Amino acid sequence: LTASGADAYLLHVTTTPSVAYIARVDDFDCGIMISASHNPYYDNGIKLIDCYGEKMPEETMLLVEDYIDDKLHVFDKDWAELPFAHREHIGCTVDYVAGRNRYMSYLISLGIYSFKGVKVGLDCANGSSWNIAKSVFDVLGADTYVINNKPNGLNINNNAGSTHIEGLQKFVVENGLDVGFAFDGDADRCLCVDEKGNVITGDHILYI
């Protein structure tokens, strides 16, 4: 990106929703998320987000995919040979942890009610929510208990998170918690369980 003249703002380990939020509110041209989503680490791919915080059109993503796979020369030689920027136009890399912190502040601002006294269980899937979810619930006043919050780059979604809700169900019941939330690796999916370990469906969450 920088070699082609773009400036890259690094949010570091963060969630897909945070990239979408920052792309929109900070007027970026686009957002890029490297993620395996709810899959194993070796399925890492690229999620492309437009300046409105929405998923880019399918045709745009297919164009990028063809460029990566070196297929574009068949259709358009100019696209296939994108030039590097001249030295004076090379982009810069910016450490933008402040953007992730801004997203966390936004989440906290959405809290209408205090969670004081509520025992909340979180399953972070050893993914990108590990350094966000607990901090948000703590500020909202919850007594927060967390599992699968030690990512090492290989253990993401490994018998953890929203695709393995049984782990959170057991954790909530055994520790007498009031509610539990399980995220997938990039935290754009969430499942909820009640104090008895029953899964709260998406319809119920939407209603709440």
Language-model features and meaning:
Residues L1-D43, S135-V193:
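N-terminal small/polar loop signature for handling phosphorylated ligands or for N-terminal nucleophile
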Residues T15, S129, G202-L206:
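Catalytic-loop motifs flanking and including active-site residues across diverse enzymes
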Residues Y21, Y67, Y103-Y106, F183, ...:
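Aromatic side chains
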Residues F28, V74-F75, I208:
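Short, charged/polar low-complexity linear motifs in solvent-exposed/disordered segments
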Residues N39, G53-E54, G127, A187-D188, ...:
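Short, glycine-/Ser/Thr-/acidic-enriched flexible segments
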Residues N44-V173:
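Gly/Ser/Thr-enriched, mixed-charge loops and adjacent short helices
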Residues L48-C51, L191-E195:
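Short beta-strand-to-turn element immediately C-terminal to the catalytic PLP-Schiff-base lysine
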Residues K55-P57, V146, N198-I208:
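Gly/Ser/Thr-rich active-site loops/lids in small-molecule metabolic enzymes
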